[in-house]
């Protein structure tokens, strides 16, 4: 996938770093429909979370609803026609040893119009091992995350209280910090 190759180039990784099991034994697609809500302050389309996989490519649709956490506030992302949003997932945060962060986000509803979004997830194989790449670890920069099989990572992610994305990343952080 071209976007992963470009990420490698920008981060100083070999161009084929994400080729194979880590770049996806499969691609998952979620189509989300959010009907209008008479009182959007009382319900969310999706609660705050970080995506667990490598990257997410989101076609947000024309109606605003994606919000990202920034310095304690929620910032609404305005959809741009004919464009995608690329979210870095928790597994990419692990590979880069925290250089790239998975951003906490949520889907908000609105009272005026229904919203449709399409999310495509690059899903590493369950038996793939993900940990900080050696290019991001060295003297003065120890591994900040544990190396885990993706299947184990998913199980940990699924049992964590999804109300707190911080708990998700804490569970995979290395105890060396």
Q: In which residue ranges do the predicted regions lie?
A:
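C-terminal flanking tails of non-heme Fe-dependent oxygenases
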Residues: 1-177
């Amino acid at each position: 996938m071209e976007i992963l190759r470009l990420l490698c180039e920008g981060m100083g990784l070999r161009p084929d770093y994400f080729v194979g099991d880590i770049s996806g034994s499969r691609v998952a697609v979620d189509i989300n429909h959010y009907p209008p809500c008479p009182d959007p302050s009382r319900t969310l389309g999706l609660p705050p979370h970080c995506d667990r996989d490598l990257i997410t490519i989101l076609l947000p649709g024309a109606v605003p609803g994606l919000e990202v956490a920034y310095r304690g506030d929620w910032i609404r992302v305005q959809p741009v026609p004919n464009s995608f949003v690329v979210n870095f997932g928790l597994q990419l945060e692990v590979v880069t040893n925290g250089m790239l962060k998975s951003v906490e986000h949520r889907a908000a509803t609105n009272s005026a119009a229904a919203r449709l979004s399409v999310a495509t997830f690059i899903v590493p194989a369950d038996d793939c091992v993900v940990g900080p790449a050696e290019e991001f670890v060295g003297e003065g920069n120890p591994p900040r995350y544990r190396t885990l099989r993706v299947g184990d990572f998913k199980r940990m992610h699924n049992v964590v209280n999804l109300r707190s994305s911080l708990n998700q990343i804490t569970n995979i952080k290395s105890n060396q910090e």
